[in-house]
């Protein structure tokens, strides 16, 4: 087996695994948004506090997806 082909194949496999971080971020953001909507429907007067907490939590959740995407791009383009 050609070592260069092996390294390229493993880089593609690693990029695919790193891209799976987007799945977790999507699930987390979806759950958080659903709970925020439930909270606002129960206590409309607390909607400002709930939404600000949701935005901060979503930013942290999406940061994981961005890190996974960056690692995948690094592996694909061998930076």
Curated annotation (Swiss-Prot):
Recorded coiled-coil stretches: none
Keyword Transferase: no
Site (Reversibly protonated during proton transport): 62
GO function terms (MF aspect): lipid binding; proton-transporting ATP synthase activity, rotational mechanism
GO cellular component: plasma membrane; proton-transporting ATP synthase complex; proton-transporting two-sector ATPase complex, proton-transporting domain
Family classification: Belongs to the ATPase C chain family.
Subunit: F-type ATPases have 2 components, F(1) - the catalytic core - and F(0) - the membrane proton channel. F(1) has five subunits: alpha(3), beta(3), gamma(1), delta(1), epsilon(1). F(0) has three main subunits: a(1), b(2) and c(10-14). The alpha and beta chains form an alternating ring which encloses part of the gamma chain. F(1) is attached to F(0) by a central stalk formed by the gamma and epsilon chains, while a peripheral stalk is formed by the delta and b chains.
Protein name: ATP synthase subunit c
Organism: Clostridium botulinum (strain Hall / ATCC 3502 / NCTC 13319 / Type A)
Gene: atpE
């Amino acid at each position: 087996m050609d070592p260069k082909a092996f390294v390229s194949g493993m880089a593609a496999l690693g990029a695919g695994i790193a891209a799976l971080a987007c799945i977790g971020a999507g699930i987390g953001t979806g759950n958080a948004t659903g709970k925020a909507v439930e909270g606002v429907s129960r206590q409309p007067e607390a909607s400002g506090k709930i939404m600000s907490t949701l935005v901060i939590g979503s930013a942290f959740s999406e940061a994981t997806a961005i890190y996974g995407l960056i690692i995948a791009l690094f592996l694909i383009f061998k930076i």
